[in-house]
């Protein structure tokens, strides 16, 4: 069993057991996956600026509890699989601020991503409990790192072939065979972690 499933299954059992037994409502699951923008790099300290525009004042009110601290959803939970290098892991709990970019997967990063206001909005809009499954890594490519198996191996286009097999230059791999072997090894790595 994949490490991510080993972590996620107990969380799902806990959430389903508590919420569904009490409410007998289906669990609404949303998957948020992506790169650096999905990680989220907005610091909690920047919340005040949202109040500068009258159009976003209602959003700021939703983001904060009565004491001015970030809101904590009672009906929405999050499982966030992320990490740096080989140190991938899961952070989970009731949805609140701190599930943005994290250097340590299980520690509050003091940041938010789209999961925060998305989760607050879904919690307010839906009567059922909400689970957000988020997975995100910055600095990764869609054509290699997140490439799904059904897309096949990454193929150089004609321009790349002409450029890469031409004269040496900036950004051109020095050892094409090694570069292609690494590309093959890396293809789909983060897609598999995500799934």
List each language-model region with its residue ranges.
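Bacterial N-terminal signal peptides
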Residues: 6-17
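Cell-envelope and extracellular/periplasmic
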Residues: 22-195
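Positively charged n-region of N-terminal signal peptides that target proteins for export
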Residues: 1-7, 122
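Short, low-complexity interaction segments enriched in Ser/Thr/Pro/Gly
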Residues: 3, 21-22
């Amino acid at each position: 069993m994949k490490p991510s499933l080993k972590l996620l299954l107990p969380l799902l059992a806990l959430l389903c057991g508590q919420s569904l037994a009490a409410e007998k409502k289906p669990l609404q699951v949303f998957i948020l996956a992506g790169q650096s923008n999905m990680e989220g790099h907005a610091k909690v300290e920047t919340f005040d600026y949202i109040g500068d525009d009258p159009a976003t004042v209602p959003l700021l009110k939703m983001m904060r509890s009565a004491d001015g601290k970030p809101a904590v959803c009672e009906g929405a939970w999050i499982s966030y699989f992320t990490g740096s290098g080989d140190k991938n892991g899961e952070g989970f709990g009731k949805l609140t601020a701190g599930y943005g970019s994290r250097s340590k997967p299980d520690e509050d990063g003091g940041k938010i991503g789209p999961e925060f206001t998305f989760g607050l909005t879904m919690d307010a809009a839906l009567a059922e409990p909400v689970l957000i499954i988020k997975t995100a890594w910055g600095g990764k490519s869609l054509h290699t790192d997140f490439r799904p198996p059904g897309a096949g191996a990454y193929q150089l286009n004609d321009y790349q072939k002409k450029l890469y097999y031409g004269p040496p230059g900036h950004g051109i791999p020095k050892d094409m065979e090694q570069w292609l072997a690494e590309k093959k090894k890396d293809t789909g790595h983060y897609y598999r972690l995500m799934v």
